[in-house]
Every structure is written in structure tokens, then in C-alpha cells.
Amino acid sequence: MMETPNNDSSRTPDEAAGAPDPESARYVANELSVADRQVNILRDKLRHIDRQLAAATQNNSKLVGMLETAKAEILRLKNALDQEGQPPYSFGTILQLNPKRQPTAGNSGQAATEESVDIFNAGRKMRVGVSPLVNMNQLAVGQEVLLNEALLVVAGLGYERAGELVTLKEMLGTDRALVVGRADEERVIRLSGALMSEKLRVGDALSIDSRTGYALEKVPRSEVENLVLEEVPDITYEDIGGLGPQIEQIRDAVELPFLHPDLYREHGLKAPKGILLYGPPGCGKTLIAKAVANSLAARAAERTGNVDLKSYFLNIKGPELLDKYVGETERHIRLIFSRAREKASDGSPVVVFFDEMDSLFRTRGTGISSDVETTIVPQLLSEIDGVERLDNVIVIGASNREDMIDPAILRPGRLDVKVKIQRPDAEAAADIFYKYITTDLPFHESDLAEHSGDVQATVDAMIQRTVEAMYSTEKSNEYLEVTYANGDTEMLYFKDFNSGAVVQNVVDRAKKYAIKDLLTTQQKGLRIDHLLRAVVDEFREHEDMPNTTNPDDWARISGKKGERITYIRTIVQGKAGQEPGKSIETMPSTGQYL
């Protein structure tokens, strides 16, 4: 049989490569479609499972929170139950700290060697242990501690904030003090840890625990601190006008012994203990006292080479020093001089200034409603005599009624130097004016033009005309007519009642008038008319107050110190010059003072 010839050589290349059958292609496409649907179904299931998982996670978080809340509530209830059944803690005050010690022949027991504290608890003194959780170094005597039911110190607290008030009288070593309590009862107390590092001085008020005998804290006493104003004055002698001779007298009495103590000792001289400044009010007594303190500080710095050396000016407010309780005023005086000695102990000059000295230390036996001066005056005398051992303390008293001060205070050896601060005359008033009218002030153009623009010449002319107006004895300046017991009469002018304070008021008024003119007329500068107007207004302000001036001072001005004034008549003719003069009724028995 003849074989069939092979037809492969007659096929196309595609047929030779094995092209898919159409039926097979449809089958494959169908399978792919089914696979896609299954993938989409699986994706949907996966998303659903993810949502279920997220919801389960959220529910789980809520469940955890609820469980935590339930746990906390259970713990709170458990703690509440524990606290309800827990015994109370007690308080104690530390009396002594006992660190751990080595046993000795007589003290080998645990109570004597182990770390412990002595406390005061429920009226008993006890030695108790300290919890290991409490740092022994953070405990101090006088401090409160917390004790458990076994009386073991489990916590350190603060210091008691309430207690009995006492006054420190004397320090006894470093940890004890002598204090004065109610009814002048003296007591020895111990200082708590809070006061060990604090500087205490005699007169300080302390709060104490009367049960334990510990001083707990230092209490500020505002009513005492207000009586003494400690300051470093910035007033110099150059700031004071019209008192040249008085200042020179004070400098000789105060600064010479301070600058040349060797010469004074060589000649057997002692520095004065005190100065009395007396005279009418408003004439510079307080300013001089401050200038003395400032000058002493400057001289002390020059002598010692210590530029940081300060001076202290203890300004005693006289009327406020008085106290209705017996012994309180004397205690305040002792406190003042104790503070002065403390400040002067390091070489700083101290001036103790008693203003209105007559209100405190008047002549014994002259009191009408009380005899408080019978104890205050001796207290001051003893303190002044005690200043003898201190070279840096000087007492300065100021008064406009020096005749009322007890003679024992004014005798030599106490207030040695007595300086009368008189009312300023015309020359002194001009000197005071120069302190307030200076060349740096704005002056009106018309006043400057009268002196070719020379500011100093303008100031000189203003002051000269103002002083002439103040010290004129014309009829317009008549103020009072004084009649004495012997029938003599004397006319007193406004110049007889002038003072440094009046001069300052005149200048202040003139400056105020200049400001008002600037606001209304737009013309700037001080004018002589402002000063003259201020003089008139200042004098007229005193029209209704002639009886406020000391009649004894009027007698001194007229040279009849011992004569009694029986009648006073005002001559002022009213602010507008139209009102009639006024008179004070004749007093049949006025005594030495009106």
C-alpha cells in the first residue's frame, strides 16, 4: 500500500504554531469571569470582616474602660472601708531630736541608742521612734509631727500658726530667750528651728506655744514699727535756707566731736548727748535734724574710708507713742533706744529725733487728766544717760513750746545744746526764696525783657520785690494789735509770722497761678505779679486764724516775754479790703497762755 504523503509542509506558520480553538477561548474567558466574581465576593467578605473587627475593637475598648471604672470604684470603696476601720492619727510637737548613738556603759538600751525624737503629746513628754520613710534631717525642734496608733512618727508637718504673744527681753545663748508676757510675767522659752536662723533683737514680738515652751515665729508689730521710721536722709545743709548761724552752731556741737574724738579726749571734753531745737513751727527744725544725720554719715565715711556707711534717722512720732496701758509708752521708748544702739554698734551714726517733744516729756506734775509724764520722763532720762557709752547716737528734740518740757531733760549733760530756730528776717527769707525759685524755671518774656534776657537778674529782682512786699510795715500789712496786762499795745505785721513753710507756700501758689495763666491765655512763664498775688493770698488766708498762733511767741517777738496778753484785735481788712476787722473778746483770766 502506498503511504499518504505528509501535509505539514503545506500548513501556514500560524497553523504550525497551534492556534487556539474557538471553543477553548470561550471556555477560558468564562473561567476568568467566574474567577473575577469570586475575587469580588472575597473582597466583600474581607471588608465585612474588617468592619466586624473594628466594631469588636471598639466594643473591647468600651469594655476595658468600664472594667477600669469598676476597678477604680471597687478600690475606692475598699479604701473607704479601710479608712473607716483605721485608727486616728495623733499630733505631737518635737522637743528634742535624738540621732543614733553608740551604746555606753550607762546607756546601752534601745531607747537610748536608736534614732528617736522626744515629743509633747496629749500633755505628756514621750520618746518615740521615727518611721524609716521619714528623713530625720528634715525634722526640727518645735515642729509638729504626725503619729500613728503605735506612736511612731510617720510624717513631719509645719509649725503651729497660733499662739500667745510675748515680747523678747533678752537672749540666753543661741537657743533660749527671756520673754515678757501678760501682766509683765517673765518666762524662759526655747527657740524653734524656724527662729534659729532668724536675727532676733530686744523688743521683737514672738508667738509661743505655752504648752511646750517654744517660740514659734516672729510677729510683725505694725503699731510699734510705725512709731520709728528708719531712713537714710537725703537732706543736706545746703538745702536749708536762712539758718546759717544756727547750722554753724549745730555743726560745731555735733561734727567736731565726731570728727576729732582724740582732741576731745585730750582736752577732757565729752560729745554732747542731745540737741534741743525750739522755735515757731515751720521754720526748719525737722530739716536740720535730717541734715545732721546726713552730714554725720558723710563725715563718718570720710573718716573710716567706708563709702557704704549709712546714717539712720529714727523719727519718733510723739503723740502716737502714748498708750493708754500703763508701761507701754515706756516699753516703746526702751525699744527705740535699743534699736538705736543696735544700729550704732557697727559705727553708723544714729540720730533719734523726737518731734513735738513737749507732747511727750512735759514738766512732771502739770498733767490735768493724767500723770503719765511722771514715768515717761524718767524713762527718757535713764535712756539718755545710757547713751553715754555710745559715740554714734545723738538725741535731737524739736518743740515750739520748750517751756513745757521737763527741766530735768533740758539740763546740761542731757540736751546740752539748745538752738532757737527763729522766724526768718528779710535776708533769711530771700535765702529761702532762692531754694525754690531757681534759674531752670520758665519765666515770662516780659519779665525777662526788663533785664535784657538775664535769667539770674530776673530771679534776683523777683525775690527782692517779693521780700519787700512781705516785710513791708505799711498799713496793708498790719495783722494784729496786741494789748498787754500793763496797758501797752503793739502792732504786729505779717512779717512777724513769716516762716520757711510760708515762703514755700508762696512760691507754690505763684507756680500754680503761672500754670493757670498758661492754660487760659497761652502765655508761659512765672511773673513777678504771680509772686505778689501769692503773698497777698497767703497772708489773707490767716485772717480768721489769729488765735492759732502761740501768744507767748508773740510776746517774744515784741521783747516782752514775761508780760501777759489780755486783748488781741485783728487788723486785716478782709480779702477784698472791704470787710471790717475782727477782734477776740477780752479774756478776764487767760493765764500765761491765751
From Swiss-Prot:
Gene3D superfamilies cross-referenced by the UniProt entry:
1.10.8.60, 1.20.5.170, Nucleic acid-binding proteins (2.40.50.140), P-loop containing nucleotide triphosphate hydrolases (3.40.50.300)
Which UniProt keywords are listed?
A: ATP-binding, Chaperone, Coiled coil, Nucleotide-binding, Proteasome
Query: Which segments does the entry list as coiled coil?
Result: 35-86
Q: Which GO terms describe its molecular function?
A: ATP binding; ATP hydrolysis activity
User: Segment Docks into pockets in the proteasome alpha-ring: which positions?
Assistant: 593-594
A Gene Ontology biological process noted in the UniProt record is: proteasomal protein catabolic process
* Cellular component annotations (GO), alphabetically ordered: proteasome complex
The protein's annotated pathway: Protein degradation; proteasomal Pup-dependent pathway
Q: Where is the composition biased (Polar residues)?
A: 1-10
Q: Does the keyword Metal-binding apply?
A: no
Q: Which InterPro entries match?
A: AAA+_ATPase, AAA_ATPase_domain, ATPase_AAA_core, ATPase_AAA_CS, NA-bd_OB-fold, P-loop_NTPase, Prot_ATP_ID_OB_2nd, Prot_ATP_ID_OB_N
- List the residue ranges of the region (Disordered): 1-23
Binding residue positions for ATP: 282-287
Per its UniProt record, what PROSITE patterns does this chain match? Answer: AAA
To which protein family does this belong?
Belongs to the AAA ATPase family.
Q: How does it assemble?
A: Homohexamer. Assembles into a hexameric ring structure that caps the 20S proteasome core. Strongly interacts with the prokaryotic ubiquitin-like protein Pup through a hydrophobic interface; the interacting region of ARC lies in its N-terminal coiled-coil domain. There is one Pup binding site per ARC hexamer ring. Upon ATP-binding, the C-terminus of ARC interacts with the alpha-rings of the proteasome core, possibly by binding to the intersubunit pockets.
Entry comment, domain topic: Consists of three main regions, an N-terminal coiled-coil domain that binds to protein Pup and functions as a docking station, an interdomain involved in ARC hexamerization, and a C-terminal ATPase domain of the AAA type.
User: What the protein does?
Assistant: ATPase which is responsible for recognizing, binding, unfolding and translocation of pupylated proteins into the bacterial 20S proteasome core particle. May be essential for opening the gate of the 20S proteasome via an interaction with its C-terminus, thereby allowing substrate entry and access to the site of proteolysis. Thus, the C-termini of the proteasomal ATPase may function like a 'key in a lock' to induce gate opening and therefore regulate proteolysis.
Q: What is this protein called?
A: Proteasome-associated ATPase
Question: Where does this protein come from, organism-wise?
Answer: Arthrobacter sp. (strain FB24)
- Provide the gene name from the record: arc
